[in-house]
A protein has these predicted regions:
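Positively charged, low-complexity intrinsically disordered regions
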Residues: 14, 36, 115-117, 121, ...
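Short cysteine-rich loop/turn motifs with clustered Cys
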Residues: 2-33
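Short recognition patches in nucleic-acid-associated and regulatory proteins
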Residues: 28-48
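Arg/Lys-rich, low-complexity, intrinsically disordered N-terminal tails that contact nucleic acids
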Residues: 1-9, 120-138
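Bulky hydrophobic/aromatic packing residues
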Residues: 20, 80, 134-138
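Polybasic, low-complexity binding patches
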Residues: 41-59, 66-131
Length: 138
């Protein structure tokens, strides 16, 4: 785990809260990962930001649920992805996880789920996994 990830977990008291920047349950600290918010990792080096692991550019998400789900949303509905990202940027600026931001994120996720509940991948499996819905705390 990167040092910035550890620092943000501590600063935002994520283990004590028990949920990440999108309101997903945290079971194990090792499951958490850094998500690039403003400058995608693929663009960071060209902009002189190294790999972009900077506090102002990140949120902490549960890799197997919220992080993977967010990238699925990015691929399917860029507007919803940007709306969720905006809420997480706001939390980053505030320096804390805010219940109103988390509620707006939940509303966006529920809208995505209504629109894409029957979408399937190339292998015929539903794109929205049960854990994406069940492991939300908000």
């Amino acid at each position: 785990m990167r040092e910035i990830t550890k620092e943000m977990i501590k600063e935002y008291r994520l283990m004590k809260l028990g949920y990440d920047f999108m309101g997903y349950e945290i079971k194990n600290k090792q499951d958490l990962s850094f998500h690039h918010l403003i400058v995608p990792r693929r663009n960071c080096e060209a902009l002189g930001l190294g790999e972009g692991y900077l506090k102002w550019n990140g949120s902490i998400l549960n890799q197997n649920t919220s992080h993977d789900y967010l990238h699925l949303i990015e691929a399917k509905d860029l507007d919803m992805f940007m709306a969720i990202t905006s809420e997480m940027i706001d939390q980053n600026i505030k320096g804390c996880l805010d219940i109103e931001n988390l509620r707006r994120i939940r509303d966006i996720l529920e809208c995505f789920e209504r629109e894409h509940s029957s979408d399937r991948g190339k292998k015929g499996k539903l794109l929205i996994k049960d854990d994406y819905v069940r492991r939300r705390k908000f």
